[in-house]
Structure formats: C-alpha cells, structure tokens
C-alpha cells in the first residue's frame, strides 16, 4: 500500500502528502471546510477566474514548505523529522480560522476577532482531539520555538503563505504580475543563527517578489470594484444584524442565524463555546443563500443591497487622494434617500467612506536578510541596488468613496 497520497494541483503539478499526521489534517472536517470558502472572496466580481478555494491555497503552501525543507536540509541545515512534520502541519493549518469573506465577517459578525486568533483556537481544539500531536506545530505557529526560521517560513516577509498566494492568485485572476518565481526564491533560502537568510545571488528574485506583491495588492486585493463589493456586503450584513436585533424575522442558516441574532464581542467569542461551534459551520454558501432570499425581503434597504450583491449591481467607486467633503457626503445621501424613498439614516447603508493604507515592506516587522559569501548579512533595503525598496516602504494612502449608483448611471 502506498505511503502517500498524490494530489494534482494546476499551479505546482503533483503534490505529495505523506500518510499519517499530515494526511489526517488534510482529511479533517476543519480543513475540508476551506473547500467551501473562496480564497479571494469577492474578487470574482472583477476577475471571473478567481474561483479557487482556501483549501487549494493551503495545499500549495504545504507543497512549497516541503520543497523548502528539502533545500534547507541539502544545504546542511539540520532539521529533525519531527520539526519538518510540525512546520508542514502549521502551514496546512495557518488559514483554518478564515470565515466566508473573511475580513467582512470579522468586522460585522465575529466581534472583531481576527482569523489568526480563530486559527489558533481551532488548532488547539484539534490538538486535543489528536492527543497532543500538534504541540510542536502550535509552538512554531506562536513563535515560541527556538528555531525562529521555522516560524518565519509560516509567517514572515518570505513565508510559504505569500509565496503560494501570489503565484496562485496570479494564475487564477490572469494578472501576470504576481507570477513570482517561487522555486527560485526557495533555492536561495538558507539559515544563519536560527534565522532565515537569502543568498546574495537571490537579490533580484526578492526585489521582483516585493514589486509583484505591491502590484498584486493594487490590481487585485485592493481593486476598487473588489473594495466596493466588500463594503456593500459589510453594509448588507450590518443591516441584517440591525433588523435581527429588532426582532425582524430573517431567513438564515442556523449558524448565520446565531451570529445575526446574538450581539457578539471579542470577550464572548473567546469564552462561549457556542461561538466557535457556529463559526466552523459557516462557509460561503450560508452568505450567498441568505442574500438570494433577502433579495425579496420587505425591508427596502436589505433587499436592494442583497439584489445588488446577487446581480452584480455594485456601488460606484471613486478613489481619491483626499477625504470627501461634508457637503459632498450630504449631497450623495440626499440623492439616495429620494431615489429609494427612504430616510437619511437608512440612506447611510448605501454610502461607504474609507481609506486604505498599504506599504509592502516594514523593516521592523520582519526584515529580509541577505547573506554574502563571507558570511556577513545586510538587510535587503541596504543590499538592493534598485531604489525600489524605499518606494516599497513608503506608505500609500487612498480614499475610497463607494455609493449607490443613480438610476441613469450605467456600469
């Protein structure tokens, strides 16, 4: 009988999963839930190909981790089999705490608890079921293990999470800028004093990686239409929650119903087992099914927003470098309340103003160390000939104004 399972992945080809702990994790219901959650949430409103799931991403990141362990070992870095298995388990589980449309859900229904916190709660829960087999994986995930480079491979500037999602998201969206040479970067990785370093001949690959990441952020992750659909979903769920807490009857799956009809804060999420229990029952289907049914609800705010989500009648977006004036805000709200025959308070659900800040490289977070033949190291910001690092470290702030289109405004 074979000692491994082989999965064919469109991005990396054949991925080998050894039987035992790692295969048990892949088959676990908590990881299988990620097959029902899209990696890029609402980005398919812009890039119709972006239908891939968080499960596919977890497998891809696992594959890259396996390759990295092989390369680091071949360079004479001693990694115990137990450490290799633990770091592979940690990367398989790194996204287990994502809900459907993750950031939307965190901010509207999950009481502001981040997916990283939920991932850890779920790992600890799985660890109990698996009789402590994930102890080392959790230590690495929490950065409590002496070999720091293992944590850096799970969560750092050059982690396997990023190396996979840039390649994968580029592949499925068709945005070629993200198509980084992950294999080349992995070959350049090494370890010095228990920290991850990159061989000096890999500088150009790293510069390319940082630039690709920046381009993918503005073209995919922060694309104005994706931002608009996200804001629209936030407002739809916020309205649904407001109606639910007023006692209005709404269609919802049992898990979604739990979050709509109970006001939940961070403290309760941590202390009530019901929160986690219901959270792991949620996936994209709960949200889409609710939106379909809410499209015909008697509440004009909820039904208009839900229909907009279902039929891709999304908010109009303006991206500016300065904030909106009070007068402009009032003008938009007046038009919307006339258009839908609703009051100003209700009209606010059809306007969203936010700013987004993004810089690709923060030295203080996790610098990328370049190692030279003589053993000395320098940060990429100093080692790079290109001036792009100073550009990448600069904060870029954009203001997004999203609002309901007027009736005579096309797409």
Regions found by a protein language model. Give the residues of each.
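Short active-site segment of divalent metal-dependent hydrolases/proteases
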Residues: 93, 97-98
